[in-house]
Amino acid sequence: MEATFFTLPSSTSHSYPFSLKSHFNNSLTLPTHPHFKPKSKNLTIRSAISRTKKEETVETVKQQLEDCYLLAGIGYKGLTVKQFQELRSQLPDTTKLLVAKNTLVLKAIEGTKWEALKPCMKGMNAWLFVHSEEIPAALKPYRTFQKEKKLEENDFTGAVFEGKFYGPEEFKALETLPTRAEIYAQLLGSLKGPASAVVGTIQAPARNLVMVLKAYVKKLEEEGGSQ
């Protein structure tokens, strides 16, 4: 049964009707504001933006892997934005430096030959994409930068080259690969020399032999084009 209306004394001579029912109902009602928006909607928008950015990063990594000869991780913890900008300016045009979360890079390389890079997926990594066969020339700028800035802690965390994983302790093998000029000299020297020299070239590691053959084919193409 609804409570009856009555008046409360006030400092003025006027009195106003007061309903217990309306009072108790209103006391349990949260105030509304015309500009109030549910938080869940904002969270949904932020989540969608975050998901889109992650998808874009994965796609960027996949694009960088096209025509990529070597992919290396660099521990970047502690590096400043200024240092990153300086490092990027010292890299050759065929080498790209990208900062991306390990989980996103792992998603991009899943099911590919680059999946061998899994041991690198620890800590904070920047990723070096080398789009050139001149591997030593691509790695040297960072080594120089590392020594100049005394960044011993920010070393290569690993790399994948021709489907094989190279740990930090194996980078010497990558940094001492023969350059194209050296391959030309080696090939020409073996062809002009005794048969034993040619045999020695053929018996070289498969990786070096492939590079020698590629260089020789390229040389023949260049000579054919100049005629």
From Swiss-Prot:
GO terms for cellular component: chloroplast; ribonucleoprotein complex; ribosome. It holds the Pfam family Ribosomal_L10. Its main location: plastid. GO terms for molecular function: rRNA binding. InterPro entries: Ribosomal_uL10, Ribosomal_uL10-like_sf, Ribosomal_uL10_bac, Ribosomal_uL10_bac_type. Transmembrane segments: none annotated. Keywords: Chloroplast, Plastid, Ribonucleoprotein, Ribosomal protein, RNA-binding, rRNA-binding, Transit peptide. It is found in: Plastid, Chloroplast. Residues 1-47 form a transit peptide. It comes from the Eukaryota. Belongs to the universal ribosomal protein uL10 family. This protein binds directly to 23S ribosomal RNA. Part of the 50S ribosomal subunit. This is Large ribosomal subunit protein uL10c. It comes from Nicotiana tabacum. The lineage of its organism: Eukaryota, Viridiplantae, Streptophyta, Embryophyta, Tracheophyta.
